[in-house]
Amino acid sequence: VAIAMTQTGGGCRATNYIGFIRRALQNAGMHQIPVVSINAAGLESNPGLKFTPKLLIGAMQAIVYGDVFMRVLYRMRPYEIYPGSANRLHKYWQQVCIDSITGKNRNSFKKNIQGIIRDFDQLPIDENLKKPRVGIVGEILVKFSPSANNYLVDLLEKEGAEAVMPDLLDFFLYSAYNSNFKYEKLGKSKKGAIMGNAAIKALEAVRKTARKELEKSRHFHPQAKIEELAR
């Protein structure tokens, strides 16, 4: 058993969470559980952890699954005609995606994305009801973790609003795209910019199906590209 925690390497709290986790484990009498840092800044070395292509692809697919779920669930649930129908549909597809990611049917990623968007797009909702849309922004863990933000999405929906959450993948795209600014304005290496742009292409390739299906849907908007957001 081990805990893997990402570290950004910057000055925000995301760099320091790993230290708090280790301290919490020690205080709980579970100091034997290792906490592995996942970072691209060389903060810690983890010789026992190897990022294989299969692991990286699975991680990217998991992120896209989560982003698509947030996009379709938060869009449809506030307007559902049958209470609980959106959550039931989410629970069904969640298990399908878990089975896919854990290797039971890894090649079904494209088919699953198509099915998720199709089924949520057909979910019965009140088409005449309009609610204020409230965007959620902020520090990355607090933004995406319900337990860290006191279940903000649930609160907004109870108060009669529709929550809008940006994609987690966009954070990685921003980090990769930022290497261009560092090269052009801060004197960083060109190699970093090249690698960043290659990462953008790889990430966009993974969510290509999601973007295409969202564009064809009636109720959802596709993700904006990082180049457009940067402008």
Label for each model-derived stretch:
Residues 1-231:
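An N-terminal assembly and electron-transfer interface module characteristic of large anaerobic redox
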